[in-house]
């Protein structure tokens, strides 16, 4: 399950991290003055003269190599277009594990704050107090890997070409920009229109790449390619074996190596990413020492299968990391574009039939915790809390959007006796399906059109198939016929992109600063946009209104209320059958690899690790 979540992180980097920090002002008294950082809400943690992020080791040796494995395949080095959105090699840009090795952004996000950006390609930033415009001054030292300077023209070109040929969300962002203008030799200003919001300047700064105008062919940009790209990042592509391996080499002339936001990162001379068909072969390669680290997501394996000699000899080290962000949402996703899942009562009924207690005990050694909220384990979660006055005000125009038990904070997923045969949730599911017009004849559930109730769960790994089989067994007790179809990675990505499935296991990374990415997950406008993350096909005015409210919030209290209100609407919509999460992050490593002592709020950070051998 861990790698399934990592995949979605690598495709679309989402906001991370949590809690409040010391009171260092993000700006001078004049908020429009150029500065070194931007914060979404409140203050930033680090002063203007900070030397490095506190979760890095600025004295880490720069040497050696890191070899890691991932499950899947790739056929492109272009992460910015729809055609190769989900088949691009890992590590190039916006990768949840490896960061931005080749392409960079104007500013870099700290992984130890809710949503704060620090100088990178832009050495200074100025912003209007109302966030109607933002202006960046480029670092004069910024260079592409071929030695050419990074210029304002590159920034202008990036927005032009991504609007014309880029994938979501890049292609739609210019719709919020009234104008982009060159205001100096190294400065560029974005002025926003009425479609913008308070978060949008942060996205311009921290989640839009800057591309080299001189090195990109506009006519072919929309195609997949295996040509090594020119970037401004710390690594260049050294070699490529399509679908099997990509090797990155640290650029010895990297322009930003002495920036405070870069010190302690990018310590390996070479990083190799090896592709495997499944986790079993990947784990065997790790045991043999072919791979340096193994990111573990299987509690049974973590508990029972690390008994090989290298572990006993202390050559392989098992690390446990705690993070401060909400747990990721993993669940069975109903594709509500399919008529069989259009009725919320049907989705609610099927949600009652997942037996977490049995699965956790029998499949996962009791290691998992049940996920209930889309912001599980954080102050943004609505679970266990009655809606406050501000939430009720936001939800008032949408009567019926939130179930009463969700509104008053008493809702929770069903808790079974763990036997695998608990009749209480089954009876509730039976009643809901009956209310929705289903009948039960000869051991089969018959839908309102007179057809047997049947659907497919699409999976892509043995781990996914295992939990789908457990769910299938429970559904069959009510006469629901479920077929589990495991497909290869290429077919999975294609069907995912075109929403060609009944049900999948979906994963969403969560943060304490949700924002515009919520439109791509839940917004009505994204329902039929290929490449969006609206896997459930949500199109609900109440959802849209809550997203607008969280983006318009000017203080933390209003923001929290808006997110909780969105959480309540999503839970009440029964779009996901929430599954489970691990309370920790597990990584096994050979002793030649080391990491900093401090773990930031978002968890371990591979770009800050290093090689220890002589």
UniProtKB/Swiss-Prot annotation:
GO molecular function annotation: peptide transmembrane transporter activity
InterPro entries to which the protein is assigned, alphabetical: Peptide/Ni-bd, SBP_5, SBP_5_dom
Listed GO biological process terms: microcin transport; peptide transport
Coiled-coil portions: none
Extent of the signal sequence: 1-28
Annotated Pfam families: SBP_bac_5
Main location: periplasm
GO cellular component term, pick one: outer membrane-bounded periplasmic space
Claim: Metal-binding is one of the keywords in the record: no
Family as reported in the entry's similarity comment: Belongs to the bacterial solute-binding protein 5 family.
Name of the featured protein: Putative binding protein BMEII0691
Organism of provenance: Brucella melitensis biotype 1 (strain ATCC 23456 / CCUG 17765 / NCTC 10094 / 16M)
């Amino acid at each position: 399950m861990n790698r399934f979540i990592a995949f979605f992180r690598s495709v679309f980097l989402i906001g991370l991290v949590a809690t409040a920090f010391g009171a260092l002002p993000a700006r001078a008294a004049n908020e429009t003055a150029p500065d070194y950082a931007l914060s979404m809400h409140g203050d930033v943690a680090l002063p203007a003269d900070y030397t490095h992020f506190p979760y890095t080791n600025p004295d880490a040796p720069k040497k050696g190599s890191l070899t890691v494995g991932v499950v899947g395949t790739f056929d492109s080095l272009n992460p910015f277009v729809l055609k190769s959105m989900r088949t691009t090699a890992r590590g190039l840009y916006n990768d949840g594990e490896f960061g931005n090795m080749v392409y960079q952004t104007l500013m870099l996000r700290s992984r130890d704050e809710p949503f704060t950006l620090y100088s990178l390609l832009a050495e200074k930033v100025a912003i209007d107090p109302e966030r109607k415009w933002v202006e960046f001054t480029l670092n004069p030292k910024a260079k592409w890997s071929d030695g050419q300077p990074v210029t304002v023209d590159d920034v202008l070109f990036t927005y032009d070409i991504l609007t014309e040929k880029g994938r979501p969300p890049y292609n739609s962002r210019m719709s919020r920009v009234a104008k982009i203008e060159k205001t100096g030799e190294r400065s560029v200003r974005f002025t926003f229109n009425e479609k913008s919001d308070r978060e949008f300047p942060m996205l311009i700064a921290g989640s839009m790449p800057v591309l080299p105008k001189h090195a990109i062919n506009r006519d072919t940009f929309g195609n997949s390619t295996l040509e090594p790209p020119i970037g401004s990042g710390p690594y260049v592509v050294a070699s490529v074996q399509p679908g099997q391996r990509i090797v990155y080499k640290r650029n010895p002339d990297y322009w930003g190596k002495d920036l405070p936001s870069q010190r302690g990162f990018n310590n390996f001379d070479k990083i190799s990413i090896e592709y495997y068909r499944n986790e079993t072969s990947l784990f065997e390669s790790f045991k043999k020492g072919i791979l340096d680290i193994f990111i573990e997501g299987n509690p049974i394996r973590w508990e029972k299968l690390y008994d090989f000699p290298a572990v006993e000899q202390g050559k392989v080290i098992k690390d446990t990391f705690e993070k401060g962000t909400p747990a990721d949402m993993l669940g069975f996703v109903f594709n509500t574009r399919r008529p069989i899942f259009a009725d919320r009562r049907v989705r609610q009924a099927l949600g009652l039939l997942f037996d977490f207690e049995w699965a956790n005990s029998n499949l996962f050694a009791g290691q998992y915790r049940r996920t209930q909220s889309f912001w599980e384990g954080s102050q943004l979660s609505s679970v266990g809390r009655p809606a406050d006055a501000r939430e009720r005000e936001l939800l008032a125009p949408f009567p019926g959007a939130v179930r009463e038990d969700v509104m008053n904070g008493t809702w929770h997923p069903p808790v079974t006796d763990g036997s695998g045969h608990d009749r209480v949730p089954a009876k509730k599911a039976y009643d809901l399906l009956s209310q929705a017009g289903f009948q039960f004849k000869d051991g089969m559930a018959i839908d309102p059109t007179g057809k047997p109730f049947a659907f497919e769960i699409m999976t892509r790994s043995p781990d996914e198939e295992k939990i789908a089989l457990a769910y299938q067994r429970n559904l069959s007790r009510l006469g629901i016929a479920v077929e589990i179809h495991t497909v290869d990675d290429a077919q999975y990505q294609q069907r995912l992109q075109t929403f060609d499935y009944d049900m999948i296991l979906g994963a969403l990374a969560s943060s304490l600063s949700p924002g515009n990415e919520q439109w791509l997950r839940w917004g009505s406008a994204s329902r039929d946009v290929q490449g969006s993350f609206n896997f459930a096909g949500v199109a609900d005015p109440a959802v849209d209104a809550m997203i607008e409210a969280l983006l318009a919030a000017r203080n933390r209290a209003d923001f929290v209320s808006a997110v909780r209100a969105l959480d309540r609407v999503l839970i009440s919509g029964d779009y996901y059958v929430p599954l489970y999460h691990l309370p920790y992050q597990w990584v096994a490593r050979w002793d030649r690899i080391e990491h900093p002592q401090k773990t930031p709020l978002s968890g371990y950070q591979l770009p800050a690790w290093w090689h220890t051998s002589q």
